[in-house]
Structures are given as structure tokens and as C-alpha cells.
Swiss-Prot record:
The keyword Nucleotide-binding applies. It comes from the Bacteria. The gene is gap. Its main location: cytoplasm. GO terms for biological process: glucose metabolic process; glycolytic process. This is Glyceraldehyde-3-phosphate dehydrogenase. Keywords: Cytoplasm, Glycolysis, NAD, Nucleotide-binding, Oxidoreductase. It comes from Kitasatospora aureofaciens (Streptomyces aureofaciens). PROSITE patterns: GAPDH.
């Protein structure tokens, strides 16, 4: 078994543990570090507004979470370098606080005794950025110790971009994600570094920024600098959609585009990219573990100009890719 510690037991940290409980995996979560008291962490794991009840027993014994018989040590340490990873025999740390998102900051987990770190966000200076299934082959265990899993949107965009680039060569493009609100926004109007995100998340359409288009160049280097994009946050708690508008190097037909995505979803990107012919809305894809659910009905083609669209559960889909990436790091 590979011993995993989760630093930060928020939306992604809890969803990763939930998803792991549904898998037959050799990943063993042995520790959680979060500044919240264990009883509150247990309650938030057991009851979730978006995902529903866990359906497995969760109890607390002192500083230990007992989840369906699994014992998980809980610590509340602000500084990663002071965490007891050596003492607990931790192999890989999942850095999920959203705070230690640089290689320099994440390296503190190595100083504390972990062998590798997976950052569940874009990470400046990471040894490699992986969108599982898209550039997995680029991982080298001898070179890559601090790994970034990019973002939920990058993981949704990467399969869209790869298939289209392989088919006809993307020359340039623009992406827009219509994204569920997140905890980083305000529930009511209040101070925020982004004046739009300062406004009440549950009652506003909030135009803002995304780093997904820039990060795609880390996953698919031949697309570096070719894509740009924006984000629009909308009043739903989960379930997002990304639209990619591109100009490609040659004329293609709509059937060619659809055939390419269908083949990828059934072949090399199976489990990461899903192909749908149904008239979906966001609630239909809640709980879907794919990174990217291609909506074939929304495909538009005019010669070299192509628009493709994919849905994604920005929590559950991404959490499943985190697990896939942890398994990759554990195996190699």
C-alpha cells in the first residue's frame, strides 16, 4: 500500500477521499492536515450538500478519523515543514489547501519526510504539470518529484484541445468556461481582490479570469501561446461547461470532428473523455467521473473554424483525476 497524506480537507480533499472509498485501490490515506477540528471534518465528510451523504460510518477517536474502518490521523499544523510525514511513513502528499501552490512552498512536504508531492492546482515551478490521460507519458519518476495536477478546467479543456489538434492542427483559439461558483468567491458582497468575485456568488453571473488556457501549454507544449480564455462564474454549486473556439490548419467537416471525438472517447482517452449525444444540462453531469463530457450536439464547424463544447463536474471529475495521478506516482 502507498501511504497518502492530504494537506487541506476542503472540497477537493474530501472528494478525493470519497472517491477513493469507491475504488479498489492500493492508496491508503493515513493522515489529513487541516486547521479545522476533527469533529467538524468528520461531519463535513459524512454530509455534503452537493454530493449527498457518504453512506459509510464516520467517527472520531481523539485525533483520529475513522472512516468505514480506516483510521486517519488528523493534525492541525500551519507549516508543512513541521508535519509528521516521516513519523507516519507518508509516501505522497496531496497538497490541497490552495495555499502552497508553488514548488518552493510544496517542497516543505519533502523536507517533512514525504517522497513526492501532488499539488491539486496549477503550481509555479512544478517539475511537471499533468492532465491525466492527455500527457501521462511525459511523467518521469526520476525527474518529477513535485507534480501539478493543473485545474479542473485545464483537465476538461486538455482532451478537447488534444483531439482537435491531432485532427487538424490548432493555429489559435479562445476558450470560455461557464463555471460553478466556488468557495473562493463571496457568499454576500464583500471585499475581494477581484471586484467581480467580490459580489454575491449565488445570485450573480460573474465574469472573471481563468488560467486554464495558459496552463494548456504546460500539458500540450505545441499549443503553448495559441489559446487564451476567460471564465464566467454562474449560480450553481457544481457542474461546469467549457467552450473551445479554434481556427485549425485545414478545412474539416462536422462528421470528421465528431468521429475524432467518438474514437478518442472509446480508445486512448476512455474514462477521461466521454462522448454524449444527449441534450445535457449541468445537473445531468453531476457525479460524472470523466474529465470532459463532449456534447456532440453543440459542435459547430465552418471550414477551418470549429467550436466544441464539453461539460465537467468541476469537483468529482477532477478528484478522480487526482486519484489516477496519485496511482501513477505510486506505481512509478
Amino acid at each position: 500500500m502507498t501511504r497518502i497524506a492530504i494537506n487541506g480537507f476542503g472540497r477537493i480533499g474530501r472528494n478525493v477521499l470519497r472517491a477513493l472509498l469507491e475504488r479498489d485501490s492500493d492508496l491508503d490515506v493515513v493522515a489529513v492536515n487541516d486547521l479545522t477540528e476533527p469533529a467538524t471534518l468528520a461531519r463535513l465528510l459524512a454530509y455534503d450538500t452537493t454530493s449527498g451523504r457518504l453512506g459509510r460510518p464516520v467517527t472520531v477517536e481523539g485525533n483520529v478519523l475513522v472512516v468505514d474502518g480506516r483510521r486517519i490521523t488528523v493534525t492541525a499544523e500551519r507549516e508543512p515543514a513541521n508535519l509528521p510525514w516521516a513519523e507516519l511513513g507518508v509516501d505522497i502528499v496531496l497538497e490541497a489547501t490552495g495555499r502552497f501552490t508553488s514548488a518552493k512552498a510544496a517542497r516543505a512536504h519533502l523536507d517533512a519526510g514525504a517522497k513526492k508531492v501532488l499539488v491539486s492546482a496549477p503550481a509555479d515551478g512544478a517539475d511537471i504539470t499533468l492532465a491525466f490521460g492527455v500527457n501521462t507519458d511525459a511523467y518521469d519518476p526520476d525527474l518529477h518529484t513535485i507534480v501539478s495536477n493543473a485545474s479542473c478546467t485545464t483537465n476538461a479543456l486538455a482532451p478537447l484541445a488534444k483531439v482537435l489538434d491531432d485532427l487538424a492542427g490548432i493555429e489559435h483559439g479562445f476558450m470560455t468556461t461557464v463555471h460553478a461558483y466556488t468557495q473562493e468567491q463571496n457568499l454576500q458582497d464583500g471585499p475581494h481582490r477581484d471586484p467581480r468575485r467580490a459580489r454575491a456568488a449565488a445570485v450573480n453571473i460573474v465574469p472573471t479570469t481563468t488560467g486554464a488556457a495558459k496552463a494548456i501549454g504546460l500539458v500540450l507544449p505545441n499549443l503553448d501561446g495559441k489559446l487564451s480564455g476567460d471564465s464566467i462564474r454562474v449560480p450553481v454549486p457544481v457542474g461546469s461547461i467549457v467552450e473551445l473556439n479554434t481556427t485549425v490548419a485545414r478545412d474539416v467537416t462536422r462528421d470528421e470532428v465528431l468521429d475524432a471525438y467518438r474514437a478518442a472517447a472509446q480508445g486512448p482517452l476512455a474514462g477521461v473523455l466521454e462522448y454524449s449525444e444527449d441534450p445535457l444540462v449541468s445537473s445531468d453531469i453531476t457525479g460524472n467521473p470523466a474529465s470532459s463530457i463532449f456534447d456532440s450536439e453543440l459542435t459547430r464547424v465552418d471550414g477551418r473554424h470549429i467550436k466544441v463544447v464539453a461539460w465537467y463536474d468541476n469537483e468529482w471529475g477532477f478528484s478522480n483525476r487526482v486519484i489516477d495521478t496519485l496511482q501513477l506516482l505510486a506505481a512509478r
